[in-house]
Amino acid sequence: MKFFADTAEIDAIQELAATGLLDGVTTNPSLIAKSGRDFKEVTREICAIVDGPVSAEVVALDHETMMKEAEILRKIADNVCIKVPLTIDGLKTCKKLTGDGTMVNVTLCFSATQALLAAKAGATFVSPFVGRHDDNGFDGMQLIADIRLIYDNYDFGTEILVASVRHGIHVLEAAKIGADVMTAPPAVIKGLFKHVLTEKGIEGFLADWAKTGQSI
């Protein structure tokens, strides 16, 4: 499973990238707005930190303007992945962009049939929102399982990018189902490294080693 960071915070991206375990980054207009910086500048800086895909989202809702915005975004760096909403115009834009060799992340997916349409449009990634799905009384992980089954049935190349990840259980369940990618806030990713028994084990080893009076 690939790990993407869902953030526009440069320091957090640098910290995660330094582990060698970060495969990409996803951003959206809300995350960019929080940074208080120019979106091109932020996107360019992120693209220089990570080698993998960096999702940058269009804000237009019509196909023609989406294409104009996508043209601006993809000139920022070679690893920019254009993010479009799962709408008719969004999928029309996806079809055109992927046909030209541009990576596209189709976002705001809330049903398996939407994901099917995204795959037919040639999406590089489809982003089902599991946390938000759960918030509205649905089963986010069942959505991921349904998409996985459909994609396997038809051998679609579109990667399932699990979004709106709230905690480690989401990551675990998505991995068990076979999702290709998960994107999560830095705090969630950093939490995956931790376990109380790991910490206790380290404390015990260090205490025992200190008693020997040795050094390495």
From Swiss-Prot:
EC numbers for this chain: 2.2.1.2
Catalytic activity: D-sedoheptulose 7-phosphate + D-glyceraldehyde 3-phosphate = D-erythrose 4-phosphate + beta-D-fructose 6-phosphate
Pathway stated in the Swiss-Prot or TrEMBL entry: Carbohydrate degradation; pentose phosphate pathway; D-glyceraldehyde 3-phosphate and beta-D-fructose 6-phosphate from D-ribose 5-phosphate and D-xylulose 5-phosphate (non-oxidative stage): step 2/3
Keywords: Cytoplasm, Pentose shunt, Schiff base, Transferase
A molecular function GO annotation: transaldolase activity
Compartments it resides in: Cytoplasm
A Gene Ontology biological process term: carbohydrate metabolic process
CDD domains: Transaldolase_FSA
Pfam family, one: TAL_FSA
Domain of life of the source: Bacteria
Annotated catalytic residues: K83
SUPFAM superfamilies: Aldolase
GO cellular component terms listed in the entry, alphabetical order: cytoplasm
Function: Transaldolase is important for the balance of metabolites in the pentose-phosphate pathway.
Record family assignment: Belongs to the transaldolase family. Type 3B subfamily.
Entry-linked PANTHER family: FRUCTOSE-6-PHOSPHATE ALDOLASE 1-RELATED, TRANSALDOLASE
Protein name listed in UniProt: Probable transaldolase
Species: Sphingopyxis alaskensis (strain DSM 13593 / LMG 18877 / RB2256) (Sphingomonas alaskensis)
Lineage summary: Bacteria, Pseudomonadati, Pseudomonadota, Alphaproteobacteria, Sphingomonadales
